[in-house]
């Protein structure tokens, strides 16, 4: 759900920044827009799909792949937060015609900053539980093997 929200926010920013008029001070094109930062929501969607699949069909390889995609989501989120903070800390002059669009774009970045934190906490929590589940499954397999070897 959060990933779909990020994709819609990217589309909103695309429409918003495409409507800018070239003025004396130029247009506002933040670094998060240039890098397609909100398009990285695709990683969050993929992580959700993997999570649902592992919940229905828990296999070791599924848990490992979900753990890997969640780690990718964590790295993506940290990168997105860093780029958004850099964007929000610097505001160059723009044409007065584009000021409203730039201001609205910065507000969208602030909203996304909150959702990046939410996605980070979800991915981190699920990664921790995946690691503990893998460790527990490995211990269960070891104990079953030891029991089989100890019976004559």
Swiss-Prot record:
Localization: Membrane
UniProt keyword Membrane, yes or no: yes
Assigned keywords, A-Z: Membrane, Transmembrane, Transmembrane helix
Pfam family, one: CD20
GO biological process, one term: cell surface receptor signaling pathway
Membrane topology according to the record: Multi-pass membrane protein
Superkingdom in the source lineage: Eukaryota
Gene Ontology annotations for the cellular component aspect, listed alphabetically: plasma membrane
InterPro entries: CD20-like, MS4A
Listed transmembrane segments: 1-21, 32-52, 66-86, 111-131
Signal peptide stretch: none
Membership in a protein family: Belongs to the MS4A family.
Functional description taken from the UniProt entry: May be involved in signal transduction as a component of a multimeric receptor complex.
PANTHER family the UniProt entry points to: MEMBRANE-SPANNING 4-DOMAINS SUBFAMILY A MEMBER 13, MEMBRANE-SPANNING 4-DOMAINS SUBFAMILY A MS4A -RELATED
Protein name, as recorded: Membrane-spanning 4-domains subfamily A member 13
Species whose genome carries this gene: Homo sapiens
Name of the gene this protein is made from: MS4A13
């Amino acid at each position: 759900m959060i990933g779909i929200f990020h994709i819609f926010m990217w589309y909103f920013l695309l429409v918003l920044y495409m409507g800018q008029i070239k003025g004396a001070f130029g247009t506002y094109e933040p670094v998060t827009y240039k890098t397609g930062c909100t398009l990285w929501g695709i990683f969050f969607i993929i992580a959700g799909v993997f999570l649902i699949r592992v919940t229905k069909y828990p296999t070791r390889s599924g848990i490992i792949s979900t753990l890997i995609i969640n780690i990718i989501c964590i790295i993506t989120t940290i990168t997105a937060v860093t780029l958004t903070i850099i964007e929000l800390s610097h505001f160059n002059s723009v044409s007065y015609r584009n000021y409203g669009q730039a201001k609205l774009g910065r507000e969208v970045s602030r909203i996304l900053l909150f959702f990046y934190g939410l996605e980070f906490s979800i991915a981190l929590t699920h990664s921790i539980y995946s690691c503990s589940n893998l460790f527990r499954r490995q211990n269960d397999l070891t104990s079953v093997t030891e029991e089989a070897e100890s019976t004559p």
